[in-house]
Amino acid sequence: MVQPHVLLVTFPAQGHINPSLQFAKRLIEMGIEVTFTTSVFAHRRMAKIAASTAPKGLNLAAFSDGFDDGFKSNVDDSKRYMSEIRSRGSQTLRDVILKSSDEGRPVTSLVYTLLLPWAAEVARELHIPSALLWIQPATVLDIYYYYFNGYEDEMKCSSSNDPNWSIQLPRLPLLKSQDLPSFLVSSSSKDDKYSFALPTFKEQLDTLDGEENPKVLVNTFDALELEPLKAIEKYNLIGIGPLIPSSFLGGKDSLESSFGGDLFQKSNDDYMEWLNTKPKSSIVYISFGSLLNLSRNQKEEIAKGLIEIQRPFLWVIRDQEEEKEEEKLSCMMELEKQGKIVPWCSQLEVLTHPSLGCFVSHCGWNSTLESLSSGVPVVAFPHWTDQGTNAKLIEDVWKTGVRMRVNEDGVVESDEIKRCIEIVMDGGEKGEEMRKNAQKWKELARAAVKEGGSSEVNLKAFVLQVSKSC
């Protein structure tokens, strides 16, 4: 019998790579050989760290996306990138698979992340079974499915900015316009940069429709999204999350927890020592992920709000966000007396620190799962893609946070920032309920990945299928 060998094909963005690597580690722990492949540029950066920390059983390979020296979002065209990654990626991915076969290690199953439907086409051509690794919530996949299957006209009405507009989709909560993925709201299409997104999601669903038994592995867990996981009858949605290092889920991470956290940045900052000096549940942590750049005006409003609440904070402002000298925050001296600003931090280490009181977040799915798994309530500031849906779930379904309201210019003002942070932090009834709910979801997340937990059982069943197909 051939040794089971999974090829994991990952879109080259930090938010895709992190959960994919955790997935790879889980497969390896269950005795599956894994080859992790992403773009040449991302592979080069990973390889430096992987040389010393990659777990045994994980192989790294690269495919070309046509931008082997890196994609520069402020210069390069996103639509051209998606065209290049398809054409170059398809050919070079075939080469990776054929080379592996020539070496006596044939790929027996292919798993790919979203935005890469062409990877499934390559697998089909080479008669290799494939599965999609969906790294957003099941709720978001359901919304896209409904959009392309009977609800498109109704959802297009959401762009009218009518505050009373809402839609009830099967097995999902009542959704307003602000709760839909941004690519479905036509007002967001004025930015032509991401016009490739919706057709790519449609192609992804068409690809699944063309399979006899489409499998979608979802970075969620049954207790968190029980109804959304059952919403699409013709797809087999399988909750296998949260895909974060097990050492942060109350378990032992036998495969080097340092590998697969934050591959593209490291910091020698003393922020952890600083957190150690702070009282329990006192820190406001502010971070907006690896892609989002805030306007100077928005940063000023956040700074003003932080100064007004007079609470210690840890704020991540990435190096590429740094302004010219004349554009730096006007109240920097006051800020530095009250809190700490860093270019990067290990988010899971921060979220699990006893001093953490709340997380002001863009609500990317990785950050959302990390906050739930750490039991930290959220002040939600969503911007685009799935973040509005995630904020809806945080505020109204899981009840672990509050969503900030933007003004007519799309800016959250300092008074609103102050109001929302105080709801979570001031010890009142609402904040207390959020804390209790956050603790509840923390325990449920840990239970899901323990032996006999829903995600562990689901992943074992998938591994059994992979092994049988050899």
UniProtKB/Swiss-Prot annotation:
Q: What InterPro entries does the annotation carry?
A: UDP_glucos_trans, UDP_glycos_trans_CS
Q: Transmembrane helix: is it a keyword of this entry? A: no
Instruction: Copy out the induction comment.
Output: Induced by abscisic acid (ABA).
Q: State the function annotated in the UniProt record.
A: Glucosyltransferase acting on both abscisic acid (ABA) and auxin (IAA). Required for ABA-mediated fruit ripening, seed germination, and negative responses to drought.
What is the protein name for this chain? UDP-glycosyltransferase 75C1
Q: What species is given as this protein's source?
A: Solanum lycopersicum (Tomato)
Q: Name one GO molecular function term.
A: quercetin 7-O-glucosyltransferase activity
E.C. number = 2.4.1.121, 2.4.1.263
Encoding gene (name): UGT75C1
A GO-annotated cellular component: nucleus
Q: Does the keyword Coiled coil apply?
A: no
Q: In which tissues is it expressed?
A: Expressed in flowers and fruits, especially in pulp, and, at lower levels, in seeds.
